[in-house]
Amino acid sequence: MTTLLRRAPFEIDKYLADFRHVEKNDLFSKGQATKTDRIIIDTVSVPKFTNEFWTSRQRQASSIHEISYRACFKPQLPRFFIEFLTEEGDTVYDPFTGRGTTIIEAGLLGRNVISNDINPLSQILCKPRLFIPDMTQLQDRLQAIKIDKKVASPINLDMFYHKNTLQEILSLRNYLIEREKTGQHDELDMWIRMVATNRLTGHSKGFFSVYTFPPNQAVSQDRQIKINKQREQIPEYRDTKKLIMSKTLQLIKNVSKEQIARLRAAGGKAVFLNDDARETDVIKKQTVSLTVTSPPFLDVVQYAADNWIRCWFNNIAVESVSRKITMSKKIEDWVDIMSGVFKELYRITKKSGFVAFEVGEVRNGKIMLDEYVAKIGINQGFICKGIMVNEQVFTKTSNLWGISNNDRGTNTNRIVIFQKDG
């Protein structure tokens, strides 16, 4: 019998402390050294590592991630931890999956995945991308969906869509509801629903709607009427089937056959949950090698206002879902909820397994959630390996009264890294 040898344990805190960022093709630079500070969490000294940790190679993300979703991190973040802290066949988990960045990236890298999100739209947008369809089969399925010219809309959407576009959307919605109700819903239907959900509203002709806010920020009917008046616009016809095909081509443009096979293999074993992240009894104890996630922050997202069209299209009761989603306005309430999440993460994490917990700066940096999270994790039994502050400097171009300005800006990720004692 052949015994597979696992690589030596990766000391991530030492790696981060010694890391030097070198720009591509700069052969003579010694690189930008990591700045290391220490903070005291209760009586525990926790290192804080600051640098630009993603390399130019790591910044090249797969096109399969190009799905709009509010407050999502870039694929480079989970890839960094998945590559260093797991091996093929290990299980990667995200308790707040969102659009599925961690799940898709783990699948691309040959890991098993467990996804959870209290928002049912998460699974609708994530799961289908593990099963990339054959283009001919997809086109045939789309052409087979009949357009009902007499279908009536249960809500007024004339301010968003041309009447013929709306007929196509309503026909597709009814088709998907019927297929699911009769148990005929398959991978092709899931893919069509995912892409259509992403194309419902947006700010270019690549979307079904007239010009409106980006797709992750749906506006109300009254607000759209005002936008139409301000822009002196009326909805033009959009060919929904053609747009679904073109968005599909965009999503798979740089996905290799090997990656498609890896995603499908991960999808075949994947577990998708729609539970409170504090109560995921389906996940067995000590089975997860790595969790990479970003939780909901302090009342920064208005679920019902942002997602009412997406929920309507997918026959989801938006107010019911909104009530289930954590929107803590007080830091004390947020800490209490996250303590429950970390208690559950400790239960399901393997010995020597890791958690990478990304948090942002909220309320203009007045509340540093990373320090709160470090304390929460330590109190639940984890070892805090450090706080990783990834600072990516970029140049942003603005144009004011014909004068161009290049301003230096910084995108910052704060990731608190934990390990379970082995």
Positions of predicted regions on the chain:
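S-adenosyl-L-methionine
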Residues: T2-E88
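Charged, often flexible domain-edge or linker segments that flank or initiate folded functional domains
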Residues: T2-L4, A8, I12, A17, ...
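Conserved proline-anchored active-site loop of SAM-dependent methyltransferases
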Residues: P75-P78, D90-L109, V113-P120, C126, ...
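Conserved phosphoryl-transfer catalytic core
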Residues: P120-K181, I316-K324
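SAM-dependent nucleic-acid methyltransferase catalytic core
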Residues: E178-T291, L298-D299
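Mobile active-site "lid"/loop adjacent to the S-adenosyl-L-methionine
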Residues: P296-I337
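A short glycine-rich, Lys/Arg-flanked "PGG" loop and its adjoining helix->strand segment in the class I
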Residues: V335-K351
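Class I S-adenosyl-L-methionine
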Residues: G365-A374, F382-G422
